[in-house]
Amino acid sequence: MKNRTIASFLMNRMKRPENRIIVLTGGRQTGKTTLARTLFPDYQFLSIEDPILRGTYARLTAAQWRELYPKAILDEVQKEPSLIESIKSVYDQWTEPRYIFTGSSQLLLLEKVRESLAGRCIIVELYPLTVPELETENWAEPVVPSPFQKLLSALDNTQEYIKSLLPDFALDPAYAKKLKAWDFYTRLGGYPALVNPELDDEDRYLWLLQYVRTYLERDVRDLAALRDLEPFVRLQRYVAFQTGAILNYSGLAQQIGISTKTVQRYIRYLEMSYQTLILPAWERNKSKQLVKAPKLHFLDYGVLQAITQKRGTPSGQEFESLVIAELLNKNAASLWMRTSFTCGPLMVKR
């Protein structure tokens, strides 16, 4: 089992008196439930996906929650939004109870959380494993920050830090482990289930194909209530082939044969279900030299391959998406491009 960078942050936050509710959200199968149960073994685990138990929990009063479940993990809590109001009542009346909500739908979960728990909770997003996390063997092994993460924390002394990386990364004693993690990441992505040593690459690829099917059949139907998935599938596949490209809604509408508003809605579904990131153009001012059109990036290369049904070395744009996804956990990133489109460096705000 791989360690997660965010683990120590969650444990420290839950010790604070003001952080009595943590909302842990992210895409399906990113390890939210495993992380919560591993870090907080003394918390009772309540599966809100169970339709029978769901009704039982919904009937509990605030006093009963405090008595029966003073510390609990509510898994997939968006399935029963009324529970959020119940926990809010517990929070407002007592200081001892602690709760962790997990959920895979950003839209269904966070809209209710923002309505009911504003100022009462912290929201943490969990993405697939990063390269430094893939290097770990277990929870006890610390996650070593990547050179880029270290560079961002050393901006006051950048030149000295860069010199410390020379003459060659290959001289690093951990080079072999890092290379293995990077190879895995650029072939299969970072979903935790894929690191099971009993799986071979063919098993992993089949898992990714099933993940995409499950995402369409469950997440998209829950999120968008779509009766006909075929137009959404066409758009998903088209933008997967175009990951890292400038996002042009009207152009996509013409290519796929749906309205621009429908394209915008479908793109929003992809983003809200943690499949893609819309990276805005860098805008310090209104200069005409800046391109304001955003880029769309898929957040996991393994899922991208399953959608496009291709394997092999990432293309230039796919590699760009790999890098963006790797940086997402740690940094706020924005794109800056000249109107000539001849170069597109990444601007990262410290």
Protein language model regions, located:
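Conserved nucleotide-sensing/catalytic segment adjacent to the nucleotide-binding pocket
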Residues: 56-100
